[in-house]
Amino acid sequence: MKVKASVGKRCEYCKVIRRRGKVYVVCKVNPKHNQRQG
């Protein structure tokens, strides 16, 4: 999970999710794409 100021989809399988006021990008196909906005 990378913590970045600016998050976004990196492939077609990434999903943008909001949890507890934070923005996450979750990707099951390529876990390297997992990000959290911080």
Curated annotation (Swiss-Prot):
Pfam families: Ribosomal_L36 (PF00444). InterPro entries: Ribosomal_bL36, Ribosomal_bL36_sp. It comes from the Bacteria. Keywords: Ribonucleoprotein, Ribosomal protein. GO terms for molecular function: structural constituent of ribosome. One of its GO terms (biological process) is translation. One of its GO terms (cellular component) is ribonucleoprotein complex. NCBIfam families: rpmJ_bact. Belongs to the bacterial ribosomal protein bL36 family. HAMAP family: Ribosomal_bL36. This is Large ribosomal subunit protein bL36. It comes from Fervidobacterium nodosum (strain ATCC 35602 / DSM 5306 / Rt17-B1). The gene is rpmJ.
